[in-house]
């Protein structure tokens, strides 16, 4: 009788253990080496080939209706803004593209996966990882520190300017002085100011112009607002902390170790240059708003997705701390569907009703997205699909998994 009483407890523990194992990918997952990536047929890994084919057709059928010319696409998206003029590079995009990665292997691909296209706000996920690297290496002590304490006066680089050097203090106002790295990462800072010719209120302004300028600021952490001026202020602050261009940091600590190719570029604006240790350095942008941001191919996006699937670990090497990934996946109080930029969460099933609660997505305009699903050891890169079709795409991919 005593043994029988213990049996339900044992079964419950076994069930709990099994569920926890489903929340993270298998230890034997394949990691692609530089310059190559093994392909497997869906059926060889137990997937339904017909369902996979249906998901690809769905992606093609639901191609984004925005123009492929990104100059026109930006105008249609942001043309109502008072400071909508592009100041960074914009490029025409390619065809609808994607790859499906299961247990590390590519089981399907379509479009032009080698083409380096703008990825828009997926760039923000790369930016937050670079901030995380600074925390991991002790350059930033903790994310609850104020940003201002880490910044010197910043000299703008303008070789045509013959007068005294121009200095900027982006975190010196009474409101900005108390902003922490955490609220900047979560887009709950309500940072105020103008950077690279773009005022904070000029990004996605409301319908009442009289409220654009001079309004009372929201207390940090209380209101979530997607705002690229503030993202770019974070990128500038992070550049100062690293004392080097952020693309070099990303290349050294993330992209080279995961075997990314040589065609990705992280661009800034033509006027976003500072003097850093006597050298001109471009402060990159956190997305494609006004141009710039990350230009990258689908394969390299997939490698980054695999890195985040494995909580910062690449084939046994911890590139970004698991603690940082955990923080990135912690819901923001003012917007529980958002962690650190640009880790969109599914904890309430609102983003992707068809996906598991612990799935997350790196999303950029276009729509470009990297779907990461630890419960199924799955990553999907989908580019240039209608935003409303995201869940339908994920639903069809998941239908192929037994």
What are these model-predicted stretches?
Residues 18-113, 137-140, 400-402:
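N-terminal leader/targeting segments and the immediately adjacent pre-domain N-terminus
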Residues 48, 104-106, 118-143, 184, ...:
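Active-site SXXK
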Residues 62-65, 149-263, 298-302, 307:
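Active-site-adjacent helix/loop patches that line small-molecule binding or acyl-intermediate pockets
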Residues 250-251, 255-329:
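Active-site-proximal binding-pocket segments
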Residues 262, 273-288, 329-379:
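Active-site Gly/Thr loop motif
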Residues 390-402:
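Short, gly/Ser/Thr-rich active-site loops of penicillin-recognizing serine hydrolases
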């Amino acid at each position: 009788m005593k043994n029988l009483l213990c049996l339900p407890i044992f079964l419950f523990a076994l069930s709990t253990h099994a569920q926890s194992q489903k929340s993270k990918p298998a230890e034997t997952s394949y990691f692609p080496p530089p310059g190559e990536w093994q392909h497997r047929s869906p059926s060889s890994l137990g997937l339904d080939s017909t369902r996979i084919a249906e998901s690809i057709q769905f992606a093609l059928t639901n191609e984004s209706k925005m123009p492929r010319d990104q100059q026109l696409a930006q105008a249609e998206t942001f043309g109502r803004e008072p400071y909508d003029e592009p100041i960074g590079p914009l490029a025409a995009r390619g065809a609808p593209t994607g790859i499906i990665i299961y247990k590390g292997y590519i089981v399907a691909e379509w479009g032009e996966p080698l083409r380096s296209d703008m990825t828009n706000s997926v760039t923000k996920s790369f930016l937050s990882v670079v901030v995380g690297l600074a925390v991991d290496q002790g350059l930033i002590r903790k994310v609850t520190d104020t940003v201002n304490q880490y910044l010197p006066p910043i000299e703008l680089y303008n070789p045509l300017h013959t007068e005294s050097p121009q200095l900027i203090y982006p975190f010196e106002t009474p409101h900005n002085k108390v902003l922490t790295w955490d609220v900047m990462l979560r887009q709950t800072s309500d940072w105020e100011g103008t950077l690279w010719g773009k005022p904070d209120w000029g990004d996605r302004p409301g319908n009442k112009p009289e409220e654009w300028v001079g309004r009372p600021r929201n207390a940090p952490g209380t209101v979530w607002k997607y705002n690229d001026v503030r993202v770019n202020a974070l990128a500038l602050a992070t550049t100062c902390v690293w004392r080097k261009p952020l693309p070099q940091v990303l290349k050294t600590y993330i992209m080279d170790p995961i075997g990314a190719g040589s065609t990705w570029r992280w661009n800034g604006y033509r006027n976003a240059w500072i003097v850093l240790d006597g050298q001109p350095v471009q402060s990159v942008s956190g997305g494609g708003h006004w141009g710039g941001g990350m230009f990258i191919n689908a394969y390299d996006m997939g490698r980054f997705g695999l890195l985040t699937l494995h909580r910062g670990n690449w084939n046994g090497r911890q590139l970004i701390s698991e603690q940082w990934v955990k923080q990135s996946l912690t819901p923001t109080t003012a917007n529980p569907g958002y962690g650190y930029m640009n880790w969109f969460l599914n904890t309430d099933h609102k983003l992707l009703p068809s996906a598991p609660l612990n799935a997350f997505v790196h999303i950029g305009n276009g729509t470009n997205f990297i779907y990461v699903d630890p419960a199924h050891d799955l990553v999907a890169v989908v580019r240039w699909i209608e935003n409303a079709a995201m869940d339908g795409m994920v639903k069809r991919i998941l239908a192929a998994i037994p």
